[in-house]
Amino acid sequence: MGPNPGPKAQPAPIRGFGVKIDQYTNDVDLKDEANVKLWEAIGDHISLVTKFLAGGGPTDYGAGGKPLLFCGAEAGVHQPWDTSIVKDHEGKNVVTDRDPKTKMPTKYLNLGLAFMGVSRNPNANAFWMSKFDGYDLDYDDDTSLCAENPKDGRLRYAKVAKRPFIRYTKMRLPPLATAIPLAVVWASLASVINANKAANALLASISVSTVSGTAPGRPTELVSAQEAILAGDYTKRLHYQGRDVCPVGCSNAGIDTSSWFVYGSLNRLDRACDRPMLLDFALANPIDTQKSHVAISACTADYENFSSFVPSSDSATSCASKVAEQAEVTFPLLLKSSGASSSQHVADVTSALEQLQAFAILSNSGCNETIKYFYSGDVIVGVYAGSGLAGQGVLSTVLEKLSTRIKDDGSVAESWSVEMCSNSSARYSLSVLVNTKGKFGAVQRGLQASKNGTCFSTETEIAASDWETVTYLAASASSITSTANPNKLTSYRATACRTIQVVSGDSCASLATQCGITAAQFTKYNSDPSLCSGLTPGKHVCCSPGTLPDFTPKPSADGYCYSNLVKSGDSCASLAAANDLTNAKIESFNKMTWGWNGCEKPFAKYKICLSTGYPPMPATIPNAVCGPQVNDTVKAPPETDLSTLNECPLNACCNIWGQCGTTGDFCTPSNSSTGAPGTAAPGKNGCISNCGTNIVTSSAPGKTYNVSYHDLGGRPPRPPFGEYNSKDSRIPANFSCERVVQLAMEMGHSTIVQLLIDAGADTSLPHPL
């Protein structure tokens, strides 16, 4: 967008979306004092805002810039709470979960802090807008920053936008503080406009200590106070954006599951979200074992119009062997079912198949095996496709066929499976497993069988001839002769042979076919007489003359170990075979590796060492809010205590999943069998920093205040005075200002907390917010 070309026709306002801020700022009062404060507060973030606005904008986003924004109507007043939304000038949604250019996760601008110069007014509150997960700042008594200046009718700016996480090593202001007009704190800092500086200055000035008995100016029953706070379980709402909402949408997160949110168990995932999701986790780590730790990567299944997705036309060719001749293979699909059939889950199952089909199409250009799950209530669908089928669209085709079958039948059995598993090698295995009884472990074990090159059994089978076939390209043995040239590809060096890796179900015959050589040549190049009877998945074998290369990883020049990001199909055995190691060596390399749970229960998308050396910085967890796995954490020097990075605000506890809280789920340290940092005992979430639940206090304050708060839950804000059906909880009158701030932040994001300076007023009555 260039400079304003002059007067032009203004588009008609879109009904139901509040007022439009003019894209050329013609109707925005740049002299309005409130606008000046807004720009001062968030001017440094404004260039980030425009990345989420369709149509872009000018490159210079200083004061007087030209944002393309529709502003939602005042929360719950002029417009229904659940329909407020942000639109661009063409009426399209512009708020997303990910920067469209960098693909980095983002969070919303903290209006409660950025607008503190305005929201110091006790009638100004930042309200959560559930439809687009953003905020509207209610201004004064009768209007909104989304509306107009009541003095002259000209429009005000309202920035409902996002910014990336900004992390600090020691102290960070939490997103949950957004909804808290900190009137008590800011009353003593009225001259300070920049809220972030003011907050940091206040928090830095607090000297805290732990006490076990009474202290002057403090409640006499500290144990009772502690129990009362913990019993409230306020931390279930702490860091609401990171822990108590559904994971990032799949359409925004992309196919790299490293960008998906991570949860420590199915139970935790169930508490966080009730929407359909796609999941990824280590196949070797049982998900239904009681008290088992499983790092589950999840995204909200939200693909739309996936039928328009176009896979790469040369994917099949690019993934095929470059030496073995390829031939078309037509293979039957075995359809199996068990349990009673019902129409109850038809819509959920077909939706699951469509979401997995969309993912399969988008990831079609990859050349690796596919292991993914759909999860929604009792409906679980798992898919496996071997690496030999990668890039050929076979999985997408099978998912579409099964979806059509279920729609035509109008019913679905308790358990269904579609399998292509009579091949000798898992390289060409495929399975789609459906369960409508919530039996996740059964689906996981079925996919494990497919990866092992075997079939998953159910009670009742429909013969393969009664259903469908699929066609794909595979290495052909029929074209191989004794004169085949085994050196079609350049080898590592003159003396090194060309290699391929074993997969489950392989035999020396199938490996020879993949190599494009005869069985006799394969035996000649691989002289170990015990090789064919002990093929281990991951192991390298020779496809040409020469010496088998040394695949043992080496430490880096700066002393760090050779790190490997664990994939969902990896196991210690396969990693050891692929890297000329043993399970015992892998265990020894990772004694100090963050999140290392041992070979029995590896975490997918976690980094591990495959050599000696310093352990690597752990892989990031997109929804982590504390600890070393927070996004954009700077690499720490060797032997740094990683648990000290990105500590929780106000000394709250941080658990091994990078979440903050003040209950036993966050504050109780425990040891795993490995003793590695960032791990915990089975069934526990552990604690990595600020552990324990002792009350933390400062010295007696010079002045104390009485405060009250009101839990509005999920209801719209600002009901008429006297109509609160809420809990009027009293904080002890002698709590210091700092302690009140701590409690307010602990109470969390879904609670609108107002701290009132009580100069003798009756605090037994609810205060209007």
UniProtKB/Swiss-Prot annotation:
Signal peptide: none annotated. GO terms for cellular component: membrane. It is found in: Membrane. It is a single-pass membrane protein. The chain crosses the membrane at residues 173-193. This is Non-secreted LysM effector LysM17. Disruption phenotype: Show no significant difference in the expansion rate of lesion diameters in apples fruits. Non-secreted LysM effector that might be involved in manipulation of host defenses for successful infection. The keyword Membrane applies. SUPFAM superfamilies: LysM domain, Plant lectins/antimicrobial peptides. Glycans are attached at N305, N368, N423, N452, N631, N671, N706, N734. It holds the Pfam family LysM. Its main location: membrane. Belongs to the secreted LysM effector family. It comes from the Eukaryota. Keywords: Chitin-binding, Glycoprotein, Membrane, Repeat, Transmembrane, Transmembrane helix, Virulence. In plants, chitin acts as a microbe-associated molecular pattern (MAMP) that is recognized by lysin motif (LysM)-containing plant cell surface-localized pattern recognition receptors (PRRs) that activate a plethora of downstream immune responses. The LysM (lysin motif) domains are small globular domains involved in binding chitin in eukaryotes. LysM1 contains one LysM domain. It comes from Penicillium expansum (Blue mold rot fungus). Residues 498-543, 562-610 form the LysM domain. GO terms for molecular function: chitin binding.
